Amino acid sequence: SKLENLIFKDARSRIVNFLHEVVQKRGRQVGYEMLLKHSLTHQDIANITCTSRQTVTLVLNDLRKENLIYFNRGRILVRDMENLKACAA
């Protein structure tokens, strides 16, 4: 549940969980990857996950360095949904 998510998960897990959920619901398959076209800002993601914009930026950059996602304005490409989900556990 969302409440359990807020209480028991750290900021990174909440952000990763949110990404996984939204990409699964609204993204489309492109080869082995999932692409989400969106209009969310880092601040929007921060508001939804009860974190700061700086934390969202840090986590997204870390996920990009780990080659789990690629993103630019308006697009998030998840390279491996299973590995992304494992990061949120």
Regions found by a protein language model. Name each.
Residues 5, 17, 86:
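Charged/polar, solvent-exposed surface patches and flexible loops
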Residues 24-89:
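Phosphate-/nucleic-acid-contacting segments
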Residues 1-14:
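A small-molecule sensor/coupling module
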Residues 18-22:
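Short amphipathic alpha-helical elements of helix-turn-helix/winged-helix folds
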